[in-house]
């Protein structure tokens, strides 16, 4: 008796839960929709929200750990490597991407769509785009730095400069300033969440909306993504140079030693492989994200699944790249082992900051 009653009440409770947490102004709802459609829709949105939540939370933790580790090296008096300076900026840019895109999209997936006003939406989109472009520029800088370090004949006058921390800091600063200025146009295009008052907005991202004419959207997309495609082309060229140099170097080593010595990869080779993994993954997912972004910008009222997939693809690299760096950096494993050993030998020892 009780079981039959619960079976009858379950669809009604699910529909009440959906209507309670999800706004009825959304374009996804229809007056003639069956209650079972509400169940499937609620399950799909909760599943998307959980995916956003896990990916964003894990990525923020990984990037925060990297930032703390690099700052710890600096504060303890040790000297940072030139690549550490670049990777610290990359971790900061990735954190911005996850914080200003992943968190709002997670809230929108769970039905919290109207927490941001018009000003909040503008700055969330602005900081997200700045973080995305800085991440792209930083990857290009890291790729070019390693290519010149492996093969100085590419640009001989840069060989000495790339060893200077001041020069690396200046290059990292150049990765920020242009994008801080160029992305100011986002403040004019983004509005608050889509509702009955601004139903003429072109694209709805769940928590914010985008409004512009078709002609202006196409022009903005071309001007916005042209530097990105140039940067991706530079990545391909620098990565190809590194692959060619490593292949030629491997052939020379095998010829000189005739395979009598153990071919143990050097530190530069391991670093280059790590950078190649980062660059290749960034290239693939950023290209897919750019295509989806252009699609949602040019096409009127894109499907919500396109918007969700665009956010997932955009967050893939920022959420996984810190763990590639953590696993490839031997200093981190040595640091964790030292902390564990100290805690085992001196369990009552309190380490002062």
Curated annotation (Swiss-Prot):
One of its GO terms (molecular function) is pheromone receptor activity. Its main location: membrane. Coiled coil: none annotated. Residues 1-56, 106-132, 191-226, 296-303 are extracellular. Residues 78-84, 154-169, 248-274, 325-353 are cytoplasmic. Belongs to the G-protein coupled receptor 1 family. Putative pheromone receptor. This is Vomeronasal type-1 receptor 1. The lineage of its organism: Eukaryota, Metazoa, Chordata, Craniata, Vertebrata.
């Amino acid at each position: 008796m009780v079981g039959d009653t619960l079976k009858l009440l379950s669809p009604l409770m699910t529909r009440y839960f959906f209507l309670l947490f999800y706004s009825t102004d959304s374009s996804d709802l229809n007056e003639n929709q069956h209650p079972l459609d509400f169940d499937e829709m609620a399950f799909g949105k909760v599943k998307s929200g959980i995916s956003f939540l896990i990916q964003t939370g894990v990525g923020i933790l990984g990037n925060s750990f990297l930032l703390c580790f690099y700052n710890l090296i600096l504060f303890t008096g040790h000297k940072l490597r030139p690549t550490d300076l670049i990777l610290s900026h990359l971790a900061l840019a990735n954190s911005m991407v996850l914080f200003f895109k992943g968190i709002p999209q997670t809230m929108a997936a769970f039905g919290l769509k109207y927490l941001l006003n018009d000003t909040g939406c503008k700055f969330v989109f602005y900081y997200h785009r700045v973080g995305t472009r800085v991440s792209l520029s930083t990857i290009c800088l890291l790729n070019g730095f390693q290519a010149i370090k492996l093969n100085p004949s590419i640009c001989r006058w840069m060989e000495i400069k790339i060893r200077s921390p001041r020069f690396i800091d200046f290059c990292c600063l150049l990765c920020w300033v242009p994008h801080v200025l160029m992305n100011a146009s986002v403040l004019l295009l983004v509005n608050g969440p889509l509702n009955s008052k601004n139903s003429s907005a072109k694209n709805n991202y769940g928590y914010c909306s985008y409004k512009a004419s078709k002609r202006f959207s196409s022009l903005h997309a071309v001007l916005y993504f042209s530097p990105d495609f140039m940067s991706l082309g530079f990545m391909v060229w620098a990565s190809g140079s590194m692959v060619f140099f490593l292949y030629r170097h491997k052939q020379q080593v095998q010829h000189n030693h005739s395979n009598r010595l153990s071919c143990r990869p050097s530190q530069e080779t391991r670093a280059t492989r790590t950078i190649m993994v980062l660059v290749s993954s960034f290239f693939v997912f950023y290209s897919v994200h750019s295509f989806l972004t252009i699609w949602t910008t040019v096409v009127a009222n894109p499907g919500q699944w396109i918007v969700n997939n665009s956010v997932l693809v955009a967050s893939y690299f920022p959420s996984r790249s810190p763990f590639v760096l953590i696993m490839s950096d031997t200093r981190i494993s040595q640091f964790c082992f030292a902390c564990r050993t100290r805690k085992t030998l001196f369990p009552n020892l309190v380490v002062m900051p």
